């Protein structure tokens, strides 16, 4: 059983939802980003989604777009992201780490080289938001052959005809995008999440986590109650932006505030027991 499976199994045994937290590699700088990763784990996150900075993150809202730009401005690269992943794995043997982002940086880096390094440093899976199942041969199938999970996104517009196609090669879990549009904006209603999860579960036995638009412990708890877990990203990234000094320098409050917020999120998903 891999780390992702173990994370969901632990959550089920404890009668709670699984908490995923997204942060961008190298935001606001590499040293602080490493400390943020540790704070997220300490706060109670079950799964880390580690964003690979990209200059044109089309599915992301203003918060994560700004996060990527801060990281890139600080000199973050895909190679440095992989080195951060390796250092994270050396510090945290059991927490699943998923690389999330867009295909362009991977293509430029070299897909096979990327997969070899990601596997070697202890990455557990990939979420590549702009690679549809029609392009599985580009990365999905080679990733799975390398031992990496390939997590698929399902949206509110994914109908009964499309779902089996999207989920045919999915592994690890399914990420339900609860809103149409970009990250960090409006939130979805409970009825729509419940209906979507029912449709997804009719096609796959994989766990389903809900993300996009989840900004509070209460919303995370509700999403975890309706699915198998919740992912929070923009609200965490906002803490970085809101605590930077005017000149862009960092301070200890960023790490402390993120740890506290993730702790509250963990309490939220624990409070919504089924």
Regions found by a protein language model. Name each.
Residues 19-35, 98-110, 149-158, 186:
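Active-site mouth loops of central-metabolism enzymes
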Residues 30-41, 158-168, 210, 214-230:
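Catalytic cores of alpha/beta
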Residues 198-204, 215-225, 229-274:
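Alpha/beta catalytic cores of nucleotide-metabolism and tRNA/nucleoside-modifying enzymes
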Residues 45-55, 125-127, 176-184, 213, ...:
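Glycine-rich phosphate-binding active-site loops on the catalytic face of alpha/beta enzymes
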Residues 19-23, 48-50, 97-101, 126-128, ...:
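Hydrophobic faces of well-ordered beta-strands that scaffold small-molecule active sites
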Residues 116, 175-180, 184-229:
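Active-site/ligand-binding-proximal alpha/beta "capping" segment
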Residues 62-98, 141-151, 155, 192-208, ...:
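Alpha-helix-loop-beta-strand connector modules within alpha/beta enzyme cores
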Residues 1-11, 30, 55-66, 76-86, ...:
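Active-site-adjacent beta->alpha loops and helix N-cap segments on the catalytic face
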């Amino acid at each position: 059983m891999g780390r992702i499976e173990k994370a969901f199994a632990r959550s089920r045994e404890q009668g709670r939802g699984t908490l995923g937290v997204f942060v961008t590699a190298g935001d606001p700088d590499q040293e602080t980003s490493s400390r943020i990763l540790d704070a997220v784990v300490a706060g109670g996150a079950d799964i880390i989604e580690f964003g690979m900075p990209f200059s044109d993150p089309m599915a992301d809202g203003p918060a994560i777009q700004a996060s990527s730009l801060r990281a890139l401005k600080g000199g973050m690269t895909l190679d440095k992201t992989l080195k951060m992943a390796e250092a994270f794995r050396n510090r945290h043997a059991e927490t699943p780490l998923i690389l999330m982002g867009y295909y362009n940086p991977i293509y430029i880096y070299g897909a096979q080289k990327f997969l070899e390094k990601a596997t070697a440093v202890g990455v557990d899976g990939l979420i590549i938001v702009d690679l549809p199942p029609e392009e599985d041969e580009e990365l999905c199938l080679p990733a799975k052959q390398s031992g990496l999970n390939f997590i698929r996104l399902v949206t509110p517009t994914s109908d009964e005809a499309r779902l089996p196609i999207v989920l045919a090669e999915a592994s690890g879990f399914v990420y339900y995008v609860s809103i149409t549009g970009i990250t960090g904006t409006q939130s979805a209603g409970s009825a729509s999440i419940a209906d979507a999860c029912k449709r997804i579960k009719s096609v796959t036995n994989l766990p389903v986590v809900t993300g996009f638009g989840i900004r509070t412990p209460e919303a995370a708890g509700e999403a975890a109650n309706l699915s198998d877990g919740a992912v929070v990203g923009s609200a965490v990234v906002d803490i970085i932006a809101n605590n930077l000094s005017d000149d862009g320098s960092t301070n200890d409050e960023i790490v402390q505030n993120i740890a506290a917020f993730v702790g509250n999120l963990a309490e939220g998903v624990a409070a919504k027991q089924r």
